[in-house]
């Protein structure tokens, strides 16, 4: 969380729109450990407000990121579409990916040059 705060203060906090999709999917799950608690707000509103408050910059998903997301599957064997788009966005944008996802952490641990992460 320190890294998020530091990037926020520096004006260099970036977010993928895939994060909104991931939040939406996660909140639709039943009582699962680690499920996000966004209160009664719809995810879209919560995400929009979070972007506004943090002044994060949204990185649009363009062709290069989409192609890289497909390559993530080939390179890592990981087939979760959201994770692949998040990793592709970080790789193409040359940014660290903030995550607590165990599989993404394994991928980054196996080859730190492939993906830079910040564990939260």
Regions found by a protein language model. Name each.
Residues 100-104:
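Short, polar loop motifs at secondary-structure junctions
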Residues 1-79, 84-96, 106-118:
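PIN-domain endoribonuclease scaffold, especially VapC-family toxins
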């Amino acid at each position: 969380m320190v890294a998020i705060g530091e990037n926020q203060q520096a004006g260099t906090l970036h977010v993928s729109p895939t994060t909104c999709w991931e939040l939406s999917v996660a909140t639709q799950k039943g009582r699962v450990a680690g499920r996000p608690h966004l209160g009664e707000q719809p995810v879209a509103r919560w995400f929009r407000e979070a972007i506004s408050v943090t002044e994060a910059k949204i990185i649009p998903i363009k062709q290069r990121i989409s192609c890289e997301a497909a390559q993530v599957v080939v390179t890592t064997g990981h087939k979760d579409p959201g994770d692949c788009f998040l990793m592709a966005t970080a790789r193409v944008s040359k940014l660290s990916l903030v995550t607590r996802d165990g599989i993404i952490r394994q991928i980054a641990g196996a080859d730190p040059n492939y993906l830079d992460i910040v564990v939260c």
